[in-house]
Amino acid sequence: MKKLQLLAPAKVNYRLDVLGKRPDGYHELRMIMQRVDLCDEIEIALTDVPGIRVTCGRKGVPDGPGNIAWRAADALLKLSGKEVGIDISIAKKIPVGAGLGGGSSDAATVLMGVNELLGLGLTDERLMEIGVKLGADVPFFIFKKPALAEGIGDRLTALEEVPSLWVVLVNPGIHVSTAWVYQNLRLTTGNPITIIPRSYSSLDEVCALLSNDLEPVTCGRFPLVSEVKEVLLAAGARGSLMSGSGSTVFGLFDDENAARTAAAEIEKTRGWFAAAVRTI
């Protein structure tokens, strides 16, 4: 039985601009995204028993077709025309419904893994075309580089330079529906569209970039998210922002010691999920 063990990393958004609503109902976005080394652990195995089986064991994460990783495997299995089974086991380390892209990363990792196991030889570009039909963030995780993401998140441009940073992720245990956030977003008009640099050489430059148009919506419904930002800044973060549609907030720190100290203190005093991670 052929199998692979893979890691599916989380991501943070240093920038998330909502530029407008498209005729197809999606929103036109502009984002700066980078992966971090908090990872779900995924095992993919080919079996002689036809069908796809996904097991996760995390409350709120479906095991069947409702799981985006299942749909990723199904897309490639149908494309291959092969009569094989695929067993997928996911050990979730990334908080669910938290703005960290865990589900999209799982799907991207399954696409890449099944492509390898079945010997399909699909390029990353082709996998990204398949992935965007599963979720807007899926192509980014196949791209594997810090990126400027435009469109619905599917048009990706690699950043020319970005520093390696220590980041503290804090999740207060609130599940935020991305669909709800976008439904309650009030688009403003007349705001100048600033030019986003493609190169960042320091922590200060990244901190100056931090902005998320979805943050006021989520914080309006869940004031605790604003409190998390304040706690991170009080713990020494040089900058802090909600990632994606929330509820995870991240803080950028000067070094590993500062990040680990802050994460341990926040977890101890507040009881929230807190992890010191590094960008990749």
Swiss-Prot record:
Pathway: Isoprenoid biosynthesis; isopentenyl diphosphate biosynthesis via DXP pathway; isopentenyl diphosphate from 1-deoxy-D-xylulose 5-phosphate: step 3/6
Keywords linked to the UniProt accession: ATP-binding, Isoprene biosynthesis, Kinase, Nucleotide-binding, Transferase
Enzyme class (EC, first level): transferase
Pfam families reported for this sequence: GHMP_kinases_C, GHMP_kinases_N
InterPro entries tied to this protein: GHMP_kinase_C_dom, GHMP_kinase_C_sf, GHMP_kinase_N_dom, IspE, Ribosomal_Su5_D2-typ_SF, Ribsml_uS5_D2-typ_fold_subgr
Residues that hold ATP according to the record: 95-105
One of the protein's GO biological processes: terpenoid biosynthetic process
One of the record's GO molecular function terms: 4-(cytidine 5'-diphospho)-2-C-methyl-D-erythritol kinase activity
Entry's EC annotation: 2.7.1.148
Catalytic reactions on record: 4-CDP-2-C-methyl-D-erythritol + ATP = 4-CDP-2-C-methyl-D-erythritol 2-phosphate + ADP + H(+)
Superkingdom as given in the UniProt entry: Bacteria
Active site per the UniProt annotation: 11, 137
Protein function: Catalyzes the phosphorylation of the position 2 hydroxy group of 4-diphosphocytidyl-2C-methyl-D-erythritol.
Family (UniProt): Belongs to the GHMP kinase family. IspE subfamily.
Protein name (record): 4-diphosphocytidyl-2-C-methyl-D-erythritol kinase
Gene: ispE
